[in-house]
Amino acid sequence: VTISGGEMLSRPDFVTALVEEAAQREISVCLDTSGFGDGDILKKLASMDNVTDILFDMKAIDDEIHHRYTGQSNQLILENLRQLSSDAAIRSKIQMRMPLISGINDGWEIIKQTAEFYQENKLQRVSLLPYHSLGISKKNHIGGHQEEFCQPDDVYVEKIKRYFEEEAVMTVEIQGKV
């Protein structure tokens, strides 16, 4: 079972009950989170034996960029990730997920800072998620507004992949290529 959302930590009582019930039924759980929520609850959930995977979204290491595009500081997120990664058993479950949006969070300094953070916290796996515009027409159809973003160049995404592999010594995959 994958528990996602919005943000799964926005419903901590429900998510905790669900993971506990899944444990009683010997059902494996994957947590899909941005890490924005109560760190103690996140660590409790992450340490449960039936939680086998944690997909952790890192939208931007730069707090100003993160705040501009999400409306929130990333300090709580980074602290929660530090706490999770300080436990080797939990750390082994973490798969970082990094959306790449051209001109927003894919600048070389941001990539280097992100790789350093991952390395400092001994994180081993990252999925790069190049932005694509699929879904824009649906959002426009239902009356939503979407800021125009650009898809990163495939060659540049490969360069980022190699950098994470070589400098941060991570296993890297590129997902969602269109």
Question: Model-predicted segments: where are they?
Answer:
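Conserved AdoMet/S-adenosylmethionine-binding subsite of the radical SAM
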Residues: 2-5, 9-129, 134
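Auxiliary Fe-S-binding modules of radical SAM enzymes
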Residues: 100-178
